C-alpha cells in the first residue's frame, strides 16, 4: 500500500520491511528487546505529517498513534 504522500512511499516500505524482519526474527523468538526501526518510523511519520499538511487534509478529531502520545483516560481516579 502506498503512503498518503507519494514522496513517503519508499520510507514506508523501508520501515515496513525493517519492522516485519525484526518482528519475525527477534520479537517472536523472545529476543526483541527494543525496536531497531525507531529512526525509520520517525522519518516516515514526519514525512506523512508534512504530506497531510501540504495537501490540507483535515485531521481534526483524529487520534494519532505514536510514542509521544499516551492515553490517560483510565488513570484509576473516580
UniProtKB/Swiss-Prot annotation:
Motif (Cx9C motif 2): 37-47
Subunit annotation: Monomer. Forms a complex with prelid1 in the mitochondrion intermembrane space. Interacts with prelid3a.
Transmembrane regions: none
Organism superkingdom: Eukaryota
Molecular functions per Gene Ontology: phosphatidic acid transfer activity
InterPro entries, A to Z: MDM35_apoptosis
Compartments it resides in: Mitochondrion; Mitochondrion intermembrane space
Chief place where the protein resides: mitochondrion
Protein role: Involved in the modulation of the mitochondrial apoptotic pathway by ensuring the accumulation of cardiolipin (CL) in mitochondrial membranes. The triap1:prelid1 complex probably functions as a phosphatidic acid (PA) transporter across the mitochondrion intermembrane space to provide PA for cardiolipin CL synthesis in the inner membrane. Likewise, the triap1:prelid3a complex mediates the transfer of phosphatidic acid (PA) between liposomes (in vitro) and probably functions as a PA transporter across the mitochondrion intermembrane space (in vivo).
Record GO cellular component, one term: nucleus
Disulfide-bond pairs as recorded: 8-47, 18-37
Keyword field contains Translocase: no
Residue ranges the record marks as coiled coil: 1-52
Keywords, ordered alphabetically: Apoptosis, Coiled coil, Developmental protein, Disulfide bond, Lipid transport, Mitochondrion, Transport
Sequence similarity: Belongs to the TRIAP1/MDM35 family.
Record-given protein name: TP53-regulated inhibitor of apoptosis 1-A
Gene Ontology BP term (one): pronephros development
Pfam families: UPF0203
Motif residue range(s): Cx9C motif 1: 8-18
The CHCH domain, residue ranges: 5-55
Amino acid at each position: 500500500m502506498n503512503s498518503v504522500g507519494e514522496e513517503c512511499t519508499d520510507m514506508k516500505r523501508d520501515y515496513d520491511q525493517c519492522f516485519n524482519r525484526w518482528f519475525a526474527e527477534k520479537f517472536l523468538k523472545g529476543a526483541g528487546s527494543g525496536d531497531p526501526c525507531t529512526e525509520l518510523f520517525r522519518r516516515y511519520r514526519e514525512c506523512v505529517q508534512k504530506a497531510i499538511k501540504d495537501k490540507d487534509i483535515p485531521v481534526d478529531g483524529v487520534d494519532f498513534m505514536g510514542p509521544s502520545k499516551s492515553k490517560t483516560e483510565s488513570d484509576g481516579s473516580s
